[in-house]
């Protein structure tokens, strides 16, 4: 519809395959350097002319004579000058596909190569996660990891939560109490304040206190993060809340972002709380922080709030993003399955 550049850009996460299509797709060396496969789809000039006439007459209300004049005056000469050289340069084209969709052999070759490339990239990503795990395995926890002090109250709540015979209603009640404490620790760790003076009920007396310096917000990592949302609303009733759905591909172990709803001005917020009750390998946490960074949120304004986390997962997260803060209640085995959300949500 629009043959012009637009100021707005869209960030795409977790795609398996991105197709860049256009007559100048292989023209710029900076673009071709980022491509895994470069395909030139070849078609007969007469076929291209007939398609163009049909499109312009049917959809744009033009006449046939004007289409033919434009073809010979501008389109065809510029094709031979700018587009066809992309076909001739070996460095710019991996495969030339004649006859378009009718060429079943070429399509099969392309799909086979795509599968091989995806498998190779998946292996590289898994190796990188393992490398991060080995680097972080023996490292001490970062100072930005805040472990909630285990008072008698918290130890008692943990005892109830860890009991498999507890009723779901009681589990929700006590987990919500603990969620309030976790969110309070998160606000203490990440929010910025400014001096503020109020007049007290006593005439002539003032109280010099603090006021939030900006708007806080939270991102709930679905589906487990919804377990902490009740605690969030009790601490910050009017807090703006976004959503992310990140799931781990069980075949490859890679996190995949399926959905996100984030405030457009989140980069200006005082503090952003990321809520997820459990962290194991840290893959979903890494991706969620990456998404916030892509939306302009500085690392030092991100606080990851979780009930339990594996040490290696924490160290992976802090190795990649050392300036964020993490609030955690319990440190557990790295591969503990996600049972909290199942117990809380009842499914």
Residue ranges and their predicted role:
Residues 116-347:
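PRPP-associated nucleotide enzymes
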Residues 64-67, 73-77, 302, 310-315:
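Catalytic phosphate-donor-binding core of small-molecule kinases
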Residues 13, 54-57, 76-146:
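NTP-dependent small-molecule kinase module
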Residues 5-58:
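ATP-dependent NMP and nucleoside kinases share a basic, alpha-helical "lid"
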Residues 1-4, 18-23, 73-77, 196-202, ...:
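Short gly/ser/thr-rich secondary-structure transition/capping motifs
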Residues 25-26, 43-49, 54, 102-105, ...:
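Conserved nucleotide-binding/hydrolysis micro-motifs of P-loop NTPases
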Residues 1-17, 62-73:
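ATP-dependent small-molecule kinase phosphotransfer cores
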Residues 16-17, 35-36, 94, 216, ...:
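Conserved acidic residues
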């Amino acid at each position: 519809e629009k043959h012009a550049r637009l100021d707005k850009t869209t960030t795409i996460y977790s795609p398996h395959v991105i197709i860049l299509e256009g007559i100048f797709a292989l023209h710029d060396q900076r673009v071709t350097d980022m491509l895994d496969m470069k395909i030139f789809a070849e078609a007969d000039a007469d076929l291209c002319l007939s398609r163009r006439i049909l499109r312009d007459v049917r959809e744009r209300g033009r006449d046939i004579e004007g289409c033919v004049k434009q073809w010979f005056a501008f389109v065809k000469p510029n094709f031979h000058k700018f587009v066809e050289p992309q076909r001739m340069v070996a460095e710019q084209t991996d495969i030339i596909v004649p006859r378009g969709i009718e060429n079943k052999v070429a399509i099969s070759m392309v799909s086979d190569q795509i599968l091989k490339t995806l498998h190779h990239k998946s292996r590289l990503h898994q190796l990188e996660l393992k490398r991060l795990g080995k680097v972080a395995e023996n490292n001490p926890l970062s100072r930005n990891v805040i472990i909630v002090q285990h008072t008698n109250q918290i130890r008692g709540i943990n005892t109830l939560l860890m009991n498999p015979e507890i009723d779901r209603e009681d589990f929700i009640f006590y987990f919500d109490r603990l969620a309030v404490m976790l969110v309070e620790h998160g606000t203490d760790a990440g929010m910025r304040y400014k001096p503020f003076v109020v007049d007290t009920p006593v005439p002539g007396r003032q109280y010099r206190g603090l006021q939030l310096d900006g708007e806080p917000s939270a991102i709930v990592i679905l589906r487990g993060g919804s377990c902490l949302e009740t605690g969030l609303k009790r601490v910050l009733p009017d807090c703006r809340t976004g959503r992310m759905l990140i799931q781990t591909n069980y075949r490859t172990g890679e996190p995949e972002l399926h959905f996100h709803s984030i405030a457009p001005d989140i980069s200006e917020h005082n503090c952003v709380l990321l809520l997820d009750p459990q962290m194991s390998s840290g893959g979903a946490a890494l991706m969620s922080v990456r998404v916030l960074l892509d939306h302009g949120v500085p690392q030092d304004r991100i606080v990851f709030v979780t009930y339990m986390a594996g040490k290696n997962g924490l160290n992976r997260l802090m190795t990649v993003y050392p300036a964020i803060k993490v609030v955690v209640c319990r440190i557990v085995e790295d591969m503990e399955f996600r049972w909290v959300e199942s117990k809380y949500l009842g499914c």
